[in-house]
Amino acid sequence: MEKAFDMNMIGDFVPTLTAYLPVTLYILTLSLLFGFVLGLFLALPRIYNIPIVNQLAKVYISFFRGTPIMVQLFIVFYGIPALTGLIGIDTSKMDPFYAAVATYALSNAAAAAEIIRAGVGSVDKGQTEAAYSIGLSGSQAFRRIVLPQALVQAFPNMGNMVISSLKDTSLAFSIGVMDMSGRGQTLITSSNHSLEVYIALSIVYYAVAVLFEWFFRVAEKRIKKNQTRIVTVFDMNIH
Amino acid sequence: MIEIKNIHKQFGIHHVLKGINLTVRKGEVVTIIGPSGSGKTTFLRCLNLLERPDEGIISIHDKVINCRFPSKKEVHWLRKQTAMVFQQYHLFAHKTVIENVMEGLTIARKMRKQDAYAVAENELRKVGLQDKLNAYPSQLSGGQKQRVGIARALAIHPDVLLFDEPTAALDPELVGEVLEVMLEIVKTGATMIVVTHEMEFARRVSDQVVFMDEGVIVEQGTPEEVFRHTKKDRTRQFLRRVSPEYLFEPKEHIKEPVI
């Protein structure tokens, strides 16, 4: 039974929910870390057009970008025990936290791969040629010359990915993870004040997202300071 | 020292190089001139295998590389003997001037950082940029960028320096400072192959001038032979058109017959 709207409850809920923010951030950090590394390995065959692996990467990316994150969560959550069961390991009692991290990592990898690929594509081919011309090997040219510039190019998109991934983690409660949203669900059950809980949740998520956005904006400015870019009239301060 | 035999290159149906032969002795300056699309840049890029010829042989120091199927090792080896200066500079945008010059030393040649720094600083002094060591490419003028490009190529002490139209992208006012640096390099006795539109430069510093058109070498020889005692009509036509006087010549006389 829903109770009458009570503004004061929001203020009470915010600190209760914020106490679970570390869990949310933990899922986010781990999944971004693993996702980024996996994304790099997915991007490489796409960039270098390596036969077969390229097709597999394409299918992988397309699948994870084309299915809802909640469906992916359940597939991984039920899929891991089913898979490990085949080799006789029982993981059905596994903490759903790990399934959530795995899902978000797999999903972030698909997004990261496309972002990295676009970043590498935006680096002038001449950079690679110049690296070759002074005797760098293919991998040296990629690691030392192309990738650093590609990551700078990709940085704004990475920022967007982090923020959208933060919002995605709010679905982890559906497989029973006790993160901020999970705690929100239990608060609703115990208090019968759904609206207040959701408003409190939105306040915390929004605050974190704004903080991230600010951080990425400042970081981007610092990183781009030394990069070559074409200065247009739009960059000039005309008063 | 360098012998290049029968280089062929095709882009799709477009036959860009139709069997180029060239011998370059140690300390020689070879300039390649010719109209756009004649294949001169492609030929130069074949020499460090940035472009893979369909056929041909490059030998340096008695080491013979079959360009059709070079091994990774051969490609890498060849690139270590050569260095290229690009029309669009291609400085590493995320590295400072000194880091740009050090890169080929510390990474490709495993030189110690302090030693590489000393070499790079010295090369940058030669091109007059000793006070820009810590600047980023985006903070330099075109002429300064190209001088860094030259220092980067010089630093690795290649057997042969390849210049791909090094002044073509520069403001007219900045061409001089780059050519000046190149003249200094000529004086050191470096082996150079230069693709250029700077005819006066070609005329004055070359030991050998090569005129290319439509994928073949039309004419080659000393500057005296090519510029003064031109043998082929196509060369004469090209030289006339690039000469400053061309614009003011009475055009009625040189109209080509319409077939």
UniProtKB/Swiss-Prot annotation, chain A:
Keyword Membrane on entry: yes
Induction comment from the UniProt entry of this chain: More strongly expressed in the presence of methionine than in the presence of sulfate.
Major place of residence: membrane
InterPro entries linked: AA_ABC_transptr_permease_3TM (IPR010065), ArtM/GltK/GlnP/TcyL/YhdX-like (IPR043429), MetI-like (IPR000515), MetI-like_sf (IPR035906)
MF GO annotations: transmembrane transporter activity
Pfam families according to UniProt: BPD_transp_1 (PF00528)
GO CC list: ATP-binding cassette (ABC) transporter complex; plasma membrane
Annotated compartments: Cell membrane
Family matches, as Gene3D superfamilies: MetI-like
Annotated membrane topology: Multi-pass membrane protein
UniProt keyword annotations, A-Z: Amino-acid transport, Cell membrane, Membrane, Transmembrane, Transmembrane helix, Transport
Family from the record: Belongs to the binding-protein-dependent transport system permease family.
NCBIfam families (alphabetical): HEQRo_perm_3TM
Complex formation: The complex is composed of two ATP-binding proteins (TcyN), two transmembrane proteins (TcyL and TcyM) and two solute-binding proteins (TcyJ and TcyK).
Functional summary from the UniProt entry: Part of the ABC transporter complex TcyJKLMN involved in L-cystine import. Probably responsible for the translocation of the substrate across the membrane. Is also involved in cystathionine, djenkolate, and S-methylcysteine transport.
Annotated protein name in UniProt: L-cystine transport system permease protein TcyL
Swiss-Prot record, chain B:
Any coiled-coil regions, as ranges: none
PROSITE patterns membership: ABC_TRANSPORTER_1 (PS00211), ABC_TRANSPORTER_2 (PS50893)
Pfam families: ABC_tran (PF00005)
Subcellular location: Cell membrane
Domain of life: Bacteria
One GO cellular component term noted in the UniProt record for this chain: plasma membrane
Presence of the UniProt keyword Coiled coil in the record: no
Membrane topology summary: Peripheral membrane protein
GO MF term list: ABC-type amino acid transporter activity; ATP binding; ATP hydrolysis activity
Major location (coarse): membrane
Record's keyword annotation contains Transport: yes
Binding site for ATP: 34-41
Database matches in CDD domains: ABC_HisP_GlnQ (cd03262)
Domain ABC transporter positions: 2-239
Entries under PANTHER family matching the protein: AMINO ACID IMPORT ATP-BINDING PROTEIN, L-CYSTINE IMPORT ATP-BINDING PROTEIN TCYN
Assigned protein family: Belongs to the ABC transporter superfamily. L-cystine importer (TC 3.A.1.3.13) family.
Subunit comment: The complex is composed of two ATP-binding proteins (TcyN), two transmembrane proteins (TcyL and TcyM) and two solute-binding proteins (TcyJ and TcyK).
Purpose of the protein: Part of the ABC transporter complex TcyJKLMN involved in L-cystine import. Responsible for energy coupling to the transport system. Is also involved in cystathionine, djenkolate, and S-methylcysteine transport.
Name of the protein in its database record: L-cystine import ATP-binding protein TcyN
Source organism per UniProt: Bacillus subtilis (strain 168)
